[in-house]
Curated annotation (Swiss-Prot):
This is Metallothionein-like protein 1. It comes from Festuca rubra (Red fescue). Belongs to the metallothionein superfamily. Type 15 family. Metallothioneins have a high content of cysteine residues that bind various heavy metals. GO terms for molecular function: metal ion binding. It comes from the Eukaryota. Keywords: Metal-binding, Metal-thiolate cluster. The gene is MT1.
Length: 70
């Protein structure tokens, strides 16, 4: 079994890696919706915002977050 964390590593109440929002697991919907967003966004300057990169959440044994301090 492979363990891929990277930007998809997130800690929740179950402290699991590999899914962005582990607390929302298995909440599938049977309806299909499409959203179209049309517009112009402002220029994003990375220096003005904190960028999330899964800090403090790394894959350990059995694809669990190590340490779980998110």
């Amino acid at each position: 079994m492979s363990c891929s964390c990277g930007s998809s590593c997130g800690c929740g109440s179950n402290c699991k890696c590999g899914k962005m929002y582990p607390d929302l697991d298995e909440q599938a919907s049977t309806t299909t919706q499409a959203v179209v967003v049309v517009g112009v966004a402002h220029e994003n300057k990375a220096g003005q915002f904190e960028m999330a990169s899964g800090e403090g959440c790394k894959c350990g044994a059995n694809c669990k977050c190590d340490p779980c301090n998110c």
